[in-house]
Amino acid sequence: MQDAVTDRFENIFGSDRSLTSVVKRVYHIPVLLALMAFMFAARLRRLDVFQTGDGVTFRGNDPWYHFRQTSYALDHFPSTMPFDPMTNYPMGTNAEQFGTLYDQLVAGFILLTSFGDPTPEYAGLIMLIAAPVFGVAAVVPAYFIAARFAGRGPALAGISVLALLPGTFLNYTLVGFYDHSAAEVFFQTLGVLAFIVALTVAEREQPVWELVVDRDFNALRNPLTYSIGAGIAAGLYMWAWPPGVLLVGFTGVFFAIKLTSEVYHGNSPEPIAFVAAVSMTVTGLMMFVPLSTFSIGGSTDYSLLQVLLPLGEIGRAHV
């Protein structure tokens, strides 16, 4: 056990444990944490404005339907309100177009941290700061994506720019804007990172069809694990926002181009096809959970579109 800990320590810090060497290896961690702390503090500056004697208030219209969804989930967890009569009143609106995972996560956190008995003031406070939390959390996968292609220094520079930029991302992640937009950014970025990692592992370990036929799970363990993770990440994105099915479309286009490129250059396309088949199977199966209509509807509702599109990628991967 001690040898394993020592090996792990050396993998992180290296055999050269001088102060300069250690700083070079881990400097990005405190810098990234400082940037995240700055972003979070900047987004919470006006918190007191949204806390009144009559409860909490929100900025804009959209946060109110999530307020109703989360309030319903607090009383009926994990169920969410299937229909929102107040949006587009008096006709109402099918609430699933907003996504429900965001409300379930926030409601679950409120219930967990209040031991199942939250006060209205505490529940309102968590809703007020939920968007800043998700916005700052999105920095982590964004950093790893940038570091994967450009290195740690440029990745930190990019996060620094993001921390200072005004615009849509800032507006959607400010305190008081209790909307699913911040969760969209987080889960989409997480999904992209998960696919990058899965493809990297597959290209390194080369899972081919013979290994599947031989049931060599030792050789398939890492590619299978990370491919399942990529599928789960894509599924979570669509649970948070049904039009997130666009991510499946984009990855499908990438897989088609990448598979063609591998064949053209004389490389085996099987590792890429393995990631596509496993991840899209997981995503497609996850979409059966919120499925509400057995027809191919629009992207704003959970329909067979969210099921068939990822499952269709499996057939493309096998061609």
Question: Can you say where each PLM-predicted feature lies in the sequence?
Answer:
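Short loop/turn hinge sites at secondary-structure boundaries
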Residues: 70, 76-77, 92, 201, ...
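Transmembrane helical bundles and short interhelical boundary loops of multi-pass, membrane-embedded
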Residues: 56-60, 265-318
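Membrane-interfacial, low-structure loops and terminal tails that flank and connect transmembrane helices
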Residues: 1-27, 202-225, 229, 265-274, ...
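Start-transfer (signal-anchor) and selected internal transmembrane alpha helices
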Residues: 1-51, 61, 137, 142, ...
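Primarily residues marking transmembrane-helix entry/exit sites
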Residues: 29-32, 121, 224
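Active-site lumenal/periplasmic loops and adjacent helix-entry segments of GT-C-fold
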Residues: 44-189, 200, 207, 242
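Alpha-helical transmembrane segments and their immediate interhelical/interface regions
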Residues: 1-28, 236, 242-245, 249, ...
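Membrane-embedded helix bundles of polyisoprenyl
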Residues: 36-40, 130-148, 153-218, 222-260, ...
